[in-house]
Regions:
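Feature marks proteins synthesized as precursors that undergo proteolytic processing into two chains
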Residues: 1-205
């Protein structure tokens, strides 16, 4: 099921309120990868195995299957893999931030200008168009209404290490419960990925 995208807003919120860098700096590595990188064999082969499902979605097909009609339709290992639309979206967010900075806005306000462009501006318009074109139900109002929520984490101490996870709306508590179970076993003595090790972890999870 598709949900209102929260990752861009979450990143902007955390960076604006708790970070020191600009959005341009933070997004630079992602933009570099989106502009093209040599794809690894594992990812390329995974795309090839899932190509029939990918073909059901025209935009995904365009990105992930550059050799449609050939025996192998996914990228070859080492082939330059590009996500041009992702690069454009990230560039628009950076552009919004940089324009805000030129107007004299603070670092925080400039980052939130990028946030607004994603959730209320032309990015939102294009997102909704593409979503609804494919039968999705997300509206511009859904995007405009989305807000990040800060909440207290939950945690356990596993063998002297504090492990923090989000609350019950995620699988976080299940992982913490598994760690509580595994606290009673000496996994190290079993040998990493040994039969006994895998069986014990599997049973706990």
């Amino acid at each position: 099921a598709a949900t209102t995208p929260g990752t861009p807003g979450g990143i902007c919120h955390m960076l604006a309120n708790y970070g020191t860098m600009s959005l341009k700096q933070v997004l630079a590595p992602a933009m570099q990868l989106a502009s093209g990188y040599p794809i690894d064999a594992q990812t390329a082969n995974s795309i090839e195995r899932g190509k029939d499902r990918i073909k059901e979605w025209p935009y995904s097909k365009k990105v992930f299957l550059p050799h449609v009609g050939e025996k192998r339709e996914a990228p070859e290992a080492g082939e330059i893999f590009k996500q041009e639309e992702l690069f454009i979206t990230l560039s628009k967010m950076v552009e919004a931030e940089q324009l805000a900075l030129k107007k004299g806005m603070s670092r925080k306000a400039a980052i939130m200008a990028a946030y607004d462009r994603f959730y209320k501006g032309d990015i939102a318009t294009e997102f909704v168009r593409g979503c609804q074109e494919q039968g999705g139900l997300i509206t511009k109002q859904d995007l405009a209404n989305w807000k990040p929520i800060e909440e207290a984490t939950t945690h356990v101490n596993y063998k002297g290490i504090d492990v923090y996870k989000l609350q019950q709306w995620t699988q976080g508590p299940a992982l913490l419960q598994a760690l509580n179970i595994l606290e009673n076993f000496d996994l190290k003595s079993m040998g990493y990925n040994s039969t006994k090790y895998i069986h014990t972890v599997y049973q706990a999870m």
